[in-house]
Amino acid sequence: MISSFEVRKATIDDYFELRNLICDVTRCTETLSREQAEERFRYNTYHPYCLVDTENGRIVGYAGFYIIPHLGRKNDSRIEHVIISKEYRNRGLGRLLCKQIIEDAKNKFNCGRIDLTVESHIAKKLYSSLEFEKVNTEVMRNSFLDLTPKSD
């Protein structure tokens, strides 16, 4: 039941719970100290969202939303890492999380578009239903990170 969930901006106090969720689906190569995490949470272009099960207070979803200022039109933006805990999937919660971000992008952050990269066919169906369209672009990356996980 969607009514028992809340989408809100994540805070520094959510960092370690969010990190565990993020590391379930993507490579995490470092654990930030609280001070390092606080610095990232202060970036004015980074807006982390979380989805909370209000019955138990547990964070069950995350999405990173980034604003990219543009000098000639409304801001561009990007959604990264829409993640829902495995046991909470297939309940419409990814949709709930994304709809809030889309609403905020339009009405709060003056964005003219949102981009995202998608690989999963399930996620493609979700994003298409939210009026995202495939554009013919190529992703190019210069990765200078060491993606070997560091032991804690």
UniProtKB/Swiss-Prot annotation:
It is found in: Cytoplasm. It catalyses: an alkane-alpha,omega-diamine + acetyl-CoA = an N-acetylalkane-alpha,omega-diamine + CoA + H(+). Keywords: Acyltransferase, Cytoplasm, Transferase. The keyword Signal does not apply. One of its GO terms (molecular function) is diamine N-acetyltransferase activity. Residues 5-152 form the N-acetyltransferase domain. Its main location: cytoplasm. One of its GO terms (biological process) is putrescine catabolic process. The active site is at residue 127. Signal peptide: none annotated. The keyword Isomerase does not apply. GO terms for cellular component: cytoplasm. Enzyme which catalyzes the acetylation of polyamines. Displays higher substrate specificity for spermine than for spermidine. May function to acetylate host-derived polyamines, thus alleviating the necessity for de novo synthesis of these molecules. Homotetramer. Belongs to the acetyltransferase family. This is Diamine acetyltransferase. It comes from Cryptosporidium parvum (strain Iowa II). The lineage of its organism: Eukaryota, Sar, Alveolata, Apicomplexa, Conoidasida.
